[in-house]
């Protein structure tokens, strides 16, 4: 259902970009002379094949590495991360087509669909990972929301925010200027709500770590030294870095839309890579080294049934 809502939003938004073009224009001329002022060019620039090639290679290789990690160490519940990395690389590859044919509606819509849709899988992976990490540590009492509800609650918020965005994008495809402006405001509200939802998730995660550090020294400090690939705090740091990358991208997309499709952010390719593509890349490539399956053993969990002073602690149910 979440993916269906996301798909509807992306299709509507892509249509809105096309509908915003002036009507009764003369046939397009040379698309490479002045792309910024070319009403037939939805990007308003010609994509760089160098940046596209480097970015595509990074994402494709990372997706393959993540798939190998999953095969080697398990944690199939992170499958959405692997799929999202592959689909994002497909979106980047489509930019090769736009560099040759910048007027192609079909290529643009497909490119936009993959590039904007794929990060949904990255958010979902972080939601799922936090739930598994908390259950593995038997530390549900330090999380404000039950671990098994974290994913459900935040994915539900995604469905609502994407539905709002889809509604706004659909209104933006009309010919009435007032309706178009209203649709853009609704779409921006949905995007801002999505950003707020993930920011809330990140805050929830930070509070969980702080409470764990203050109240559960038997979990925070290992009784015996363990290698880095068995130290849950290394995985926790990786999740934190992933959240930072996703938040950067979320802020970028929100500000970009508030400026409009001809704004500075939307029409500057370097900002697309610097504030969208590469922050998201950091958010996923970190799991190549810190693959959750190396840290989280669903059979053997951290034993927290006894605290430092010997007081029994109830084990969190899976």
Regions found by a protein language model. Name each.
Residues 69-76, 100-104, 133-147, 176, ...:
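Juxtamembrane membrane-water interface segments of multi-pass membrane proteins
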Residues 60-67, 116-143, 159-173, 197-215, ...:
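Cytoplasm-facing ends of alpha-helical transmembrane segments in multi-pass membrane proteins
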Residues 1-27, 210-231, 292-318:
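Intrinsically disordered, low-complexity terminal tails of fungal membrane proteins
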Residues 2, 14-119, 123, 132-135, ...:
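Membrane-proximal first intracellular loop
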Residues 42-52, 75-78, 105-115, 141, ...:
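Membrane-water interface of alpha-helical transmembrane segments
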Residues 108-122, 165, 183-198, 230-292:
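Extracellular loop 3-seventh transmembrane helix
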Residues 89-102, 164-175, 205, 245-260:
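Helix-to-loop junction signature of class
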Residues 52-62, 78-91, 115-128, 154, ...:
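Seven-transmembrane alpha-helical bundle of G-protein-coupled receptors
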């Amino acid at each position: 259902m979440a993916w269906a809502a996301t798909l509807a939003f992306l299709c509507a938004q892509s249509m809105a970009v096309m509908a915003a073009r002036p009507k009764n224009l003369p046939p397009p001329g040379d698309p490479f002379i002045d792309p910024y002022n070319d009403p037939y060019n939805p990007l308003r620039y010609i994509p760089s094949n160098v940046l596209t090639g480097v970015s595509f290679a990074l994402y494709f290789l990372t997706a393959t590495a993540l798939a190998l990690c999953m095969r080697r160490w398990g944690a199939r519940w992170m499958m959405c991360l692997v799929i999202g990395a592959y689909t994002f690389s497909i979106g980047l590859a489509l930019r090769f087509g736009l560099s040759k044919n910048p007027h192609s509606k079909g290529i643009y819509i497909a490119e936009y669909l993959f590039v904007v849709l794929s990060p949904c899988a990255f958010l979902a992976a972080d939601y799922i990972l936090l739930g598994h990490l908390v259950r593995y540590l038997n530390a549900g009492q330090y999380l404000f929301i039950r671990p098994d509800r974290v994913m459900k609650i935040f994915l539900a918020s995604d469905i609502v925010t994407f539905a709002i965005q889809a509604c706004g994008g659909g209104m933006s495809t009309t010919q009435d200027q007032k309706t178009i402006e209203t649709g853009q405001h609704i779409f921006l509200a949905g995007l801002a709500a999505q950003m707020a939802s993930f920011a809330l998730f990140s805050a929830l995660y930070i509070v969980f770590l702080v409470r764990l550090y203050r109240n559960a020294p038997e979990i925070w400090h290992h009784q015996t030294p363990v290698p880095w690939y068995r130290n849950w705090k290394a995985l926790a740091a990786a999740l934190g870095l992933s959240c930072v990358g996703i938040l950067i991208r979320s802020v970028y997309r929100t500000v970009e839309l508030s400026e409009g499709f001809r704004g500075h952010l939307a029409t500057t390719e370097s900002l697309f890579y610097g504030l969208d593509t590469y922050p998201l890349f950091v958010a996923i490539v970190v799991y190549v080294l810190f693959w959750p399956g190396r840290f989280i053993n669903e059979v053997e969990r951290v034993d927290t049934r006894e605290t430092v002073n010997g007081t029994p602690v109830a084990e969190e149910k899976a």
